[in-house]
Amino acid sequence: MFSHPSNFGDRAAVRGPGTITVALVPRQPGSFYHVTLEAFTVIRTRIPFTGRSGTVEQGNIIIDSGMALTTLPRHFYAQIKQAVTMQTHASEVPDPYRLFELCFRKDRSLQLPSIVANFRGDNVPLKRFNAFVTWGSATCLAFGVSESFIAYGSLAQQDFLVGFDQYAITVSFNPFRCSHA
């Protein structure tokens, strides 16, 4: 369910209609792929990802295929949670598994807002299953809180062909129906 192909080296050339390419940002330690996330947009509400300095910090998030959730600092997560709550028009319910902070009752008529990851260089529109997960009787925002490990997780990357090009120093996302590959 959480799988998506990642490509490196000669196979990292991810091209085609809808391909989104953003610059990698060299940071220490060098074992992670850092990019600059400028904001998340919930419908038309742009929520900037500013750091302690009040500006967007270079290389402020890593692309992580090993972690399911996208993890964000509490102050940024709280703003996204508020925007999603205001746009959803549904009552919150507790997460039956205590994994998520924002959940709504699972319902076919539940209207969830569109969410876009605004990276420096391009925007990645998330599908419903990239931003929300349904567990049992609840549908929850698939973002978590962390002050120390800020990551764009595998749920957000699901059904994207992801290519890391170390020569061009970029990462590309191409919408791809992995379940039909």
What are these regions (language model features)?
Residues 1-181:
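C-terminal catalytic lobe of pepsin-like aspartyl proteases
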